[in-house]
């Protein structure tokens, strides 16, 4: 038989400032239709040598804040209705976590709430600023 492992990638922050909730809901809708077995989430990190950095400098795109990115993850987890492994384990995530949905949904949401409540934008931004080029 053939083993098909479909992986979805949620690039948290890619929609830009103020667009995280909309982006998360749209991503959840797509994932809910495709039924991947694993959804991996990485946080967008903009480097000075990137085209996106040039767009920020030109004022044509605004980067989402660090706390906003965690709010986006919370919205995504809240709107996933399929059984799936959800993982945010990459170096671009200041906090790594994973769980099986729907069973671990409340634990994941609680962890995200704690990060949103406890962490400052400056501390999370410092992590991102000091992240070596991926």
Spell out what each predicted region is.
Residues 1-3, 88:
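Structural beta-sheet core signal
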Residues 7-33:
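Catalytic cores of alpha/beta
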């Amino acid at each position: 038989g053939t083993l098909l492992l479909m992986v979805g990638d949620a690039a948290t922050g890619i929609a830009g400032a103020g667009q995280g909730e909309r982006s998360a809901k749209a991503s959840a809708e797509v994932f809910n239709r495709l039924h991947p077995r694993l959804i991996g989430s990485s946080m967008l990190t903009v480097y000075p040598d990137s085209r996106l950095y040039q767009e920020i400098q030109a004022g044509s795109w605004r980067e989402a804040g660090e706390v906003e990115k965690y709010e986006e993850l919370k919205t995504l987890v809240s709107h996933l209705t399929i059984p799936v492994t959800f993982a945010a384990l990459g170096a671009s995530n200041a906090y790594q976590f994973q769980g099986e949905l729907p069973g671990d949904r409340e634990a994941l949401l609680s962890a995200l709430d704690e990060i949103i409540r406890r962490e400052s934008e400056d501390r999370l931004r410092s992590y991102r600023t000091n992240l070596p080029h991926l």
